[in-house]
UniProtKB/Swiss-Prot annotation:
GO biological process, one term: glycolytic process
Pfam families linked: TIM (PF00121)
Pathway(s) the chain acts in: Carbohydrate biosynthesis; gluconeogenesis; Carbohydrate degradation; glycolysis; D-glyceraldehyde 3-phosphate from glycerone phosphate: step 1/1
Name under which the protein is recorded: Triosephosphate isomerase
Top-level EC class as recorded in UniProt: isomerase
Amino acid sequence: MILAANFKMNHTRASTKAYIERLNAYGKQTDIDIAVFPPATALDQYETFADIGAQNAYAAEHGSFTGEIGLQQLQEFGIETVLLGHSERRHIFYESQEMIARKFAFYKERGFTIYYCLGETLQTRKKGFEAIRELLQSQLEGIDTAYENFVIAYEPVWAIGTGVAAKPEEIEEVLAYLASLTDAPLLYGGSVKPANIKEVLSIPKCDGALIGTASWDVENFIKMIEIAKEMR
């Protein structure tokens, strides 16, 4: 079971440090892996059982890439996990599949654990599952689905940050399809919160959750870890 907290553009260095300290005080739970993705300004070499990852990184060690961080910056803090393909990177920052695949290849070559996001818009959802399947295939172009340090997070765009999670049967259908393509752990993301995480984690083929808004409060996140622990 994997529970990952994506801070997005939230938290500071001080509040991230306090968050990690609270997680450490709570302690590692058997059979539940925890990942935390702080903003770039809060990345550090924290003493923690949680896997600390970058929300984004450029496909280069260093160089003239204004506003980006690369391998050199991540290595300073011992970061070996990166989140790629998030819909906010795709739709707000116009990252192409070619760019995402290039990042994937770069960090795969360096053995990083890669959390890879994909998912459909509401417009595609309304067209039916065949359209969803075609979109997911396009979002896997150039991606090595057999990579051993690979985690997929299915995040329907219309459910991210809206408070409206996808229905269990909708999630199950997509995860079953993804499971036919890869042996990688499959997470669901999209308005996951304490009120629905048990239902989400009960879905066949669901190996965990990538959690946004509901994870920003550490007590909320711990509450979700507790629910997951009770289900083991």
